[in-house]
């Protein structure tokens, strides 16, 4: 039987093992459980007294409990090619509190990876001294807290071409700037099938945006900002953006977009639109999320969505600043489902 699947492991120490070719004398054994196919799922249902059978309510994708073995060769009694040395290098690649990267590459689906950690200590048969055997099976009991296989994120950029910076002191109301009067530039990012599709996976995804803060420091105010001293917002240069939060399943919100808070110097932000996460993370650590007035991103991109053009508005930016859109690629399996 011929297989062109390549399985690799990148350890917590950066060491890479090719478990298919055995480049370090470590080969993947048979009978892998809980790893390559769908993760376990728990269905939630109800059984009303006046209803025949049951009704589906929801389902939850669970962690993966993974068991597999590796065959570690002994090609020399001592040195780097001995079982003792190879087994030691294999163990040093693993940790309980940090994940390894299990990588699977196939001609059909490319490369996908799963984050795995130790769940129990590795086991080796000690009926005989393993240092005297030509080959030993090491059994690995692992856990994958995130059950999805990932491709590398797809990242798309929009670059500002117009200088839309302004002085906040030009406006009548200090600290309160009317969006309609700010100089603005409209940017677009188009994602379609020619670049792999918007979401070709079988899972919902939450886009991540990165937006830049102002390139200008607050006049007559020290940087880094001194703790306990109020920032003079009324004279602080800032950038501001309108970021898409399009719904692909509700026409009422098909063109929903949200305006970010003003971002001053040092507040380059990552916007994670996942409702379960902190949505604004500032480079300076400032709590930008506290200035959103409770308005949150809420829409995800459904599986197998082919294309969309995202329209972004930017104000307060210098020419040449970048706005990025990052799309994760989670899959239920390490191959297929395209």
Residue ranges and their predicted role:
Residues 47, 51-81, 132-148:
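Oligomerization/assembly interface segments of phage tail-like spikes and tubes
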Residues 60-64, 94-96, 132-136, 199-203, ...:
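Solvent-exposed loop and beta-edge segments used for protein-protein assembly and interaction
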Residues 67-71, 103, 141-143, 208-212, ...:
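Residue-level recognition of well-ordered beta-strand positions that form the cores
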Residues 101-151:
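Short beta-strand and beta-hairpin "edge-sheet" elements
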Residues 157-338:
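Intrinsically disordered, low-complexity segments enriched in serine, threonine, and glycine
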